[in-house]
Amino acid sequence: MTSQLIIGLIVSVLIGSVSSTVSAASDPTNFLFRKLSFSSEENNQLFRKTIDEADALEFEEAGAKSNSLVANVEADNRIDGLTFARVLANAAIIYAQLEQPKGALELINRSVSLVEEESVFHEDIYPLMMVKAQILIKQGELAEAIDQLRRAQHITHRYGGVYSEQQTDAVDHIANVNTTLRNHLEADRQQLFNLRISENVLGADSIELVPRLEKIGAYFRSRGVSLPYASDATFSETPSLDRKERADIFSQAIRHYNRALTIQESAYGPSDIRLINTLRSLAKTRMAQISGRRYAEDILERVVKIISSNPVADIPEHAVSLINLGDTYTINGNRNASETYLKAWDLLSQTPELTNLRESIFSSVTRISPTIPPYNIIARRPSKTQEGEEIFIRATFSVRPDGRVSNINLIEGNAPVDQKKLIRLWLRTSKFRPRIEEREFVLTEGLTTYQTFQVLEKEPAETPEESSPSPTTLPEKVDETESA
């Protein structure tokens, strides 16, 4: 494994990401019509070259040939409407890849009209609606995109039944769009419906069901992370309801991961290395849950045990499992952290190549909690600052051998008092993977963080104390560098 991949594995288990954007469940080029034939050899060659160039991601060239093919087919009255519709659809897909949504929509609408002349329930309606929906999503026309996705789903129901496997792509898109629109309950419903489809197609205990269970587990983890853990009214007008919703959502995530584990254990046994990805995802979920962090230790201890006893696992993978466990111990205040880090240190001291990797991991401190920086929105510009002047705080601090922060000093800044308190609290509660030199944990001094703030209102406040942090916006930049 490369150093970057290993370091990525180390941090991934501790980070519960939050995504509020629509992620594409498929590439529009997946819906290209690839089996067309024409009486003209010129058109056959244009068609084949269009597909080949699209597959090679050469969309400019594919677009030129596609335009020529559209013109040729449109001028040939011997070609049936359905074939022309498919040629138009291919051209629309290429236009979409060229970031020409207006032209793509015009082409796809012409294609739909031709197909509807055959039947409004024709099978081709499904790919056309999927392509149109993805174009609309990129345009931000999300409500209309859902309408197209629903129509695509309806077509699959007519030909494959309510649990048609073909619809999973459409359902994924519907769920993602609803997440972006903050229709979370509807997004939840769509995610669970996709699980039912997979259960119906694959079987409730099929090993092939594991990827879907893991995907839904990750979805509900992301949902849970998006809700505040704190009960303070600053974050919510209904804190008790939010806490219950958060707990319920994390319970769903954990339940799906546990089910995936049970299926894998039945298929492979309890100590198979193929369980590791699911175990790490479950540990990440427990860490994000916060109230379940102690359980994450047990899960990652199991990962270490599986890897250490498996002859297939290599030394870097074993070291990664120990570092992930050590980081979890550090966050939880478990005294076993130091011993665990040193085991990883020793493993990575066996060859010069491993030693270089060891130094990249342990030669400097690494923030492991909180992974989300402090809020950086203030209500008004402080009265002592000018319009356009940067509002900031610069602080220095040290990281102790146990990964805790000490010697916090706000050395410079013009931000309000509330923000200074926030930065101090953020640093005080931070946990770091400590620096190790010659197998000894050492104090790291002279670290600096620089935090900027954005202003909601342009008018200056009468006093700098009147501002308050926003619970939703993250900082532009937080740098932590060691002084020379």
Regions found by a protein language model. Name each.
Residues 1-8:
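Bacterial N-terminal signal peptides that target proteins for export
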Residues 8-17:
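Bacterial N-terminal signal peptides
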Residues 20-24:
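Sec/Tat signal peptide C-region and signal peptidase I cleavage site
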Residues 25-48, 59, 63, 67, ...:
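Charge-biased low-complexity segments
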Residues 69, 73, 111, 115, ...:
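Hydrophobic packing position at a conserved site in alpha-helical tandem repeat units
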Residues 74, 80-116:
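Mid-chain, structured segments of secreted extracytoplasmic proteins
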Residues 101-143, 150, 156-157, 172:
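Surface-exposed, polar helix/loop patches in the mature regions of secreted/periplasmic/lumenal proteins
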